[in-house]
């Protein structure tokens, strides 16, 4: 018979092994091996988040190490240096998540790894530090849910104080205080905010001095949420800037030549600056598209934007045909990424190198079962192993 005893001290993990030959044998041997916790952490850091979630079920010892704040923060920091592509497939009202390495040099095919699936979900937000926010039907009610697609953990948020039809939900992050927040925006001067990590899940009403109608795109950059809107009082096109930390709104009036890019394009993070990608078909690109425009906000106070036009290669029309592509964003190596709106076989994503003016495609394998279904692609997804209930 063999038994295994493990203890965790402040700086050292003790593993004791006892081997008993027979009940009648007076001879017993016991060996103890002490392994520093930092070595255990280093081993765990090499595992994917999906495996970390499984390790929590092994023993109290394992979960005590994995739940340490220094471990979860270090795991997230390392994940930031190895970003992934996140794919979300919608089928029969369910969401299915897959991840794939985000290639620094996209010259070869890649395989997507199945993560988790969630039922009766819609209205998906962009990933924020490994987490996603969406709406889901629970007990005939619509609730806001925070989920970790890598571990499968979910947390349903309480009902907002105001239940106006169709409020827009924004999931945002403030990097200085490391706080997640959910913003509900209505067609009025009143909005609601819920802060995660305060120990109490409750909505607060915040005021906005400019009632507005929201547009279709949004992006959070360095603690500021940007989204297009229309001023209800004047009818002007604007960009709303919500400071996540102070919870204050400010507004950028959109110049006439930028209206198409701001309201019909895709807002993105371009090297820490607000930018927009747009084509002749607005936020979509197909075989008929001739070029891509990149607008970058250079000075918010002066409302200065720079415009860059990139001509698509000659083979584009023949290769793409009637396939509809979405703008995903710009990679850290300055490549514009495009992805199909629906799962196709083969499923190719495209990288347009801004500096070399070249286009490359990468085939993503592993999602063939979802052919013909809606798929969303996200850049710079990271794995987060922090338990959701520890964030509130």
Curated annotation (Swiss-Prot):
InterPro entries: F-box-assoc_dom_typ3 (IPR013187), F-box-assoc_interact_dom (IPR017451), F-box-like_dom_sf (IPR036047), F-box_dom (IPR001810). It comes from the Eukaryota. Residues 29-78 form the F-box domain. It holds the Pfam family FBA_3. Transmembrane segments: none annotated. This is F-box protein At5g65850. It comes from Arabidopsis thaliana (Mouse-ear cress).
């Amino acid at each position: 018979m063999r038994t295994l005893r493990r203890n965790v001290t402040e700086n050292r993990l003790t593993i004791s092994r006892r081997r008993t030959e027979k009940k009648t044998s007076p001879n017993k041997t016991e060996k103890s091996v002490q392994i520093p916790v930092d070595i255990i952490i280093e081993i765990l850091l090499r595992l994917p988040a999906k495996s970390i979630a499984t390790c929590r079920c092994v023993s109290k010892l394992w979960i005590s190490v994995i739940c340490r704040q220094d471990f979860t923060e270090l795991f997230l920091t390392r994940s930031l240096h190895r970003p992934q592509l996140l794919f979300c497939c919608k089928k029969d009202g369910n969401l299915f998540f897959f991840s794939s390495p985000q290639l620094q040099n996209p010259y070869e095919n890649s395989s997507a790894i199945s993560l988790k699936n969630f039922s009766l979900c819609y209205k998906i937000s962009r990933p924020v530090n490994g987490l996603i926010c969406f709406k889901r039907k629970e007990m005939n009610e619509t609730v806001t849910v925070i989920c970790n697609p890598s571990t499968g953990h979910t947390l349903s948020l309480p009902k907002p104080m105001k239940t106006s039809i169709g409020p827009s939900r924004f999931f945002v992050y403030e990097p200085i205080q490391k706080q997640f927040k959910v913003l509900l925006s209505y067609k009025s001067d009143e909005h609601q905010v819920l802060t995660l990590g305060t120990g109490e899940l409750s909505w607060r009403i915040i005021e906005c001095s400019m009632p507005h109608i929201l547009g279709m795109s949004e992006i959070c950059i360095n603690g500021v949420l940007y989204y297009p809107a229309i001023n209800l009082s004047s009818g002007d096109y604007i960009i709303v800037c919500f400071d996540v930390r102070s919870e204050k709104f400010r507004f950028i009036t959109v110049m006439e030549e930028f209206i198409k890019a701001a309201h019909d394009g895709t807002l993105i993070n371009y090297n820490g600056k607000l930018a927009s990608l747009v084509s002749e078909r607005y936020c979509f690109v197909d075989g008929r598209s001739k070029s891509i425009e990149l607008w970058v906000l250079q000075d918010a106070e002066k409302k200065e934007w720079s415009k860059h036009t990139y001509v698509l290669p000659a083979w584009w029309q023949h290769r793409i045909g009637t396939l509809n592509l979405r703008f995903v964003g710009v990679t850290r190596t300055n490549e514009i990424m495009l992805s199909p709106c629906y799962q196709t076989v083969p499923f190719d994503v495209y990288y347009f190198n801004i500096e070399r003016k070249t286009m490359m495609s990468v085939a993503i394998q592993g999602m063939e079962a979802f052919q013909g279904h809606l798929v969303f692609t996200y850049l710079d997804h990271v794995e987060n192993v922090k338990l959701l209930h520890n964030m509130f």
